[in-house]
Amino acid sequence: MSERLSPRRIPKGTDAAKLHKWAAIFLIAGIIGRAFLENALLGMNTMTSEELYAAVEADPDSMWILTAALACKVLQTCAAPLLAFLLVEGYQRTSSFEKYLVRIAGLALGTELPYNLAMEGKLLVLGSRNPVFALVLALVMLYFFSHFAGKGLKNTLIKVLIFAAAFLWCRMLRIEHGVCLVILVGIIWLARTRTNLRSLYGFCGTMACTLFDFYYIGACLSCIMFHRYNEEKGEQNRIFNYAFYPVVLLIVGIAAKFL
């Protein structure tokens, strides 16, 4: 008599793979909004705010494109809490911090030219850096946080200085979304042992981010997913996770040139 095979148990909630997929969707919305809607169709990367206002007045249909572009900006910010959360989870679960740091740093370097092409329409942009560089700084910040994990006054002051250093480096390097990503990583790190409060901490982090970028008012929506997180890795493809962002940027950047 053959044995009856019991069906594989599917964990309830949201695993890390699903968080990656949602982050990818939000990032795609942001890339399309800026590369196609803002730059290719409206030309916002080549005009001042006064010129944009005049262009919208001259062509009322442009208002619909502008509205869609702004909606994409809000959707893009929803990726930031998810990426910050995944970075904290990745740091806590990695078997080699050095290899993890090298992968993130490699992604930052590999993303720079495609990011410039998609966001600015040219390969070389000296005035800013892509957001992945903020994840590199945030990862180094977590490394030092864990080495001063005590609750005493001395350790607390050291962690404040470490956070301030990461914050200032993001400002000095002009990393896009850098300050907000560092804030979110720092706050989510505080909630690493308070699993029932992760969504609340994430919400507070996104509200703090609105001081630097008002579009983060919508990012709090993605923090709801933290509450459903089931601590499972899920079915992931590491190559996809790391190659997705620069590849999509490159494809969109090239396609936008033909619009």
Language-model-derived ranges and their functions:
Residues M1-L259:
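Alpha-helical transmembrane segments and their immediate juxtamembrane cytosolic regions
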